[in-house]
Structure formats: structure tokens, C-alpha cells
């Protein structure tokens, strides 16, 4: 992988970079070579930032998103509409909804989606915790804002069936979001319209 057989640190860096989504061997090598050849100070800053984030960022006790405290600032915000709960797959999806400014409710972040082929079932993405949160007596509407991929649709369907069976009002983002897309890559106007036109 790296030139020479004594480059264990470089090989380890390339392998670590390959763990990032969408990064293959060549991209990882380019990044590693760039950091070591042109930006050693940037490499140190990146290393410290990764270490600090890994040590201090955890899951919110209420919504499961990332936070440095026990409970995230969104869950603690008294101006939020606690009667509306948007269910998203990832913190990136939550951030995409927040950037629209069209949603002032609260969130529940699944940290994944159902994927039976990969062995990911309801327990793996916090169905139980979501049911507890949605059934707290405060939540009046659960908005399913999972992605419009096959797994996201399956997750939304399973959640919808389970929540409706418990007498909860469930809506889904409108189809203004293109099928096969992921929220963090959709333009803000489309997301805002999808929220307003949800069914």
C-alpha cells in the first residue's frame, strides 16, 4: 500500500481513513500523503479534534442525537413544540431539517435504519426508546422523516404500523423529497415544502 515495507504508521493512517464513508484506497492514500507532505500542522489539528470529539461527544439521553452534555440543547429548548416529534435516521438528517427553519418540534434520532440483510433490526435502532418517548403523553404527532431509500421506507412503514397500533397520530414527509435521496443532500426548499405538505 505505502511505498516501502517499513511504513507501518502510514499504512495505519490509510486504513483509518478508509473507514470513512465513500473513501477508498486511492482517496485515503491521497489524503494521507497530503497531510504528511503539505499540512503536518493540519494533521495535528485533525488528530486532536478527532480525539477530543471521540472523548466528549455522546448521545442525548432524550433524543439520541450527538451532544456533549447529558441532554442536547434542542431537547432543553423551552421554545420547541414538544407535541411534535420528528424521527430521523442520523444527526446529519436532523441538521438538514433544522437548517430549513420549518420545523420547531423535537427529534428522535434512530442512528440507523432497518436493514434485515445487514442484521439490523428494531432493537438495533432504538424502537423501544422511541415508543417510550412517543408515548409520553406530551407527543401528539410523530413525523416520520426517514430517508426515501428502500431501507428508510421500510423503517418508516414499520414505525408507522407500530405507532398507529398504539393509537398515535403518525405522518410522513411528503414526496417532495426525491425517492432514493438522503436528507442531508436535498436542497432546503424541498425539505421545507416536504415538512409543510406532510401527510
Swiss-Prot record:
ZnF C4-type residues are 60-75
Q: Which Gene3D superfamilies match?
A: 3.40.1360.10, 6.10.250.240, RecR Domain 1
Transmembrane annotation, as ranges: none
A Gene Ontology biological process noted in the UniProt record is: DNA repair
Q: Which SUPFAM superfamilies match?
A: Recombination protein RecR
Q: Which Pfam families match?
A: RecR_C (PF21175), RecR_HhH (PF21176), RecR_ZnF (PF02132), Toprim_4 (PF13662)
Residues annotated as domain Toprim: 83-178
Q: SMART domains from the entry?
A: TOPRIM
- Provide the alphabetized UniProt keywords: DNA damage, DNA recombination, DNA repair, Metal-binding, Zinc, Zinc-finger
Q: Name one GO molecular function term.
A: zinc ion binding
Family per UniProt? Belongs to the RecR family.
Described purpose of this protein according to its UniProt entry: May play a role in DNA repair. It seems to be involved in an RecBC-independent recombinational process of DNA repair. It may act with RecF and RecO.
- Protein name (database record): Recombination protein RecR
Amino acid at each position: 500500500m505505502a511505498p516501502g515495507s517499513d511504513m507501518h504508521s502510514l499504512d495505519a493512517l490509510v486504513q483509518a481513513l478508509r473507514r470513512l464513508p465513500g473513501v477508498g484506497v486511492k482517496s485515503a492514500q491521497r489524503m494521507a500523503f497530503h497531510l504528511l507532505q503539505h499540512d503536518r500542522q493540519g494533521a495535528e489539528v485533525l488528530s486532536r479534534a478527532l480525539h477530543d470529539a471521540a472523548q466528549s461527544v455522546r448521545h442525548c439521553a432524550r433524543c439520541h442525537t450527538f451532544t456533549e452534555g447529558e441532554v442536547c440543547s434542542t431537547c432543553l429548548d423551552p421554545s420547541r413544540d414538544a407535541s411534535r416529534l420528528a424521527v430521523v435516521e442520523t444527526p446529519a438528517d436532523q441538521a438538514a431539517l433544522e437548517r430549513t427553519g420549518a420545523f420547531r418540534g423535537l427529534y428522535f434520532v434512530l442512528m440507523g435504519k432497518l436493514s434485515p440483510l445487514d442484521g439490523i433490526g428494531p432493537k438495533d435502532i432504538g424502537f423501544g426508546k422511541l415508543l417510550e418517548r412517543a408515548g409520553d403523553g406530551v407527543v401528539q404527532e410523530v413525523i416520520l422523516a426517514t430517508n426515501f431509500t428502500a431501507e428508510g421506507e421500510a423503517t418508516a412503514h414499520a414505525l408507522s404500523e407500530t405507532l398507529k397500533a398504539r393509537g398515535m397520530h403518525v405522518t410522513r414527509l411528503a414526496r417532495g423529497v426525491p425517492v432514493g435521496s438522503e436528507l442531508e443532500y436535498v436542497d432546503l426548499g424541498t425539505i421545507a415544502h416536504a415538512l409543510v405538505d406532510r401527510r
